[in-house]
């Protein structure tokens, strides 16, 4: 017998679980230097961390949470991204530490948008903060910036006092690294824990993984494997990653359509 998702919340919950699992699979397979995973306690709450390797934010390590709407992905409401610490950036509110996604998305469309789009946007605003506030170029050649953002002080500093902005950001980067190994504030087993590199311990995991790229990196010299992590240094690389994601997404949708048919027939 066929049951609608309206009259059977259990079926709706199962479908939501499949969607979130598909989102996680897309995230974990392609994106570099940014990691996100649903919490064990609630799949609508994701833990995330980004390692910035280039630009004026280079050396920064920022933790964040992603909160999905209760009716994700059907709800048109945008996701909520909240950083764990105060970050100097035009698009991050200094009071509640939330990222303004309104300049990137107007509403959530489940057939077009995915969590990895949001993660890629997070990478982009740190890789090119000037580009994230620019709306065009004046006849004089000066950049035209947005009239209103979440942190107007950061906007004005970036546009008019760039050296001071860079100084503040670099101080912030040092502080972020000093706290990356802090004990977690939650006992959720999916919380992303970062440990100091220990060759004796971590190389054992490398051997167990049998990953050629890791073995090649660790055999080059005595440098830590983290130095060989991929970098997002250009818009071209971001575009290539998006193309790979879209191809993978097409294959995933085919599988999901068959799965939804099977669930609806229960």
Swiss-Prot record:
Protein origin, superkingdom: Eukaryota
Origin species: Drosophila yakuba (Fruit fly)
Residue span, UBC core domain: 15-178
Descriptive protein name: Protein crossbronx-like
Similarity comment text for this entry: Belongs to the ubiquitin-conjugating enzyme family. FTS subfamily.
A Pfam family this chain is assigned to: UQ_con
């Amino acid at each position: 017998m066929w049951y609608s998702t309206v009259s059977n919340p259990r079926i709706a919950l199962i479908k939501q679980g499949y969607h979130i699992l598909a989102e996680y699979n897309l995230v974990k397979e392609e994106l570099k230097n940014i990691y996100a995973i649903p919490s064990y306690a609630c799949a609508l709450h994701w833990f995330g961390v980004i390692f910035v390797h280039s630009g004026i934010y280079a050396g920064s390590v920022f933790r964040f949470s992603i909160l999905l709407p209760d009716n994700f992905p059907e709800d048109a409401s945008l996701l909520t991204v909240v950083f764990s610490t105060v970050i100097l950036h035009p698009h991050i509110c200094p009071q509640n530490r939330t990222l303004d996604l309104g300049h990137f998305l107007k509403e959530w469309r489940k057939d077009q948008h995915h969590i990895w789009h949001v993660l890629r946007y997070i990478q982009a605003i740190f890789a090119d903060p000037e580009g994230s506030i620019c709306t065009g170029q004046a006849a004089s050649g000066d950049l035209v910036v947005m009239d209103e953002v979440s942190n107007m002080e950061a906007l004005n500093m970036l546009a008019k006092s760039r050296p001071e902005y860079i100084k503040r950001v670099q101080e912030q980067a040092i502080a972020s690294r000093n706290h990356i190994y802090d004990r977690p504030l939650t006992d959720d087993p999916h919380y992303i824990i970062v440990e100091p590199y220990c060759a004796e311990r971590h190389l054992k995991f490398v051997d167990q993984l049998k990953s050629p790229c890791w073995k090649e990196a660790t055999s080059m010299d005595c440098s830590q494997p983290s130095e060989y992590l991929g970098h997002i240094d250009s818009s071209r690389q971001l575009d290539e990653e998006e193309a790979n994601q879209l191809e993978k997404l097409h294959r995933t949708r085919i599988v999901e359509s068959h799965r939804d048919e099977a669930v609806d027939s229960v």
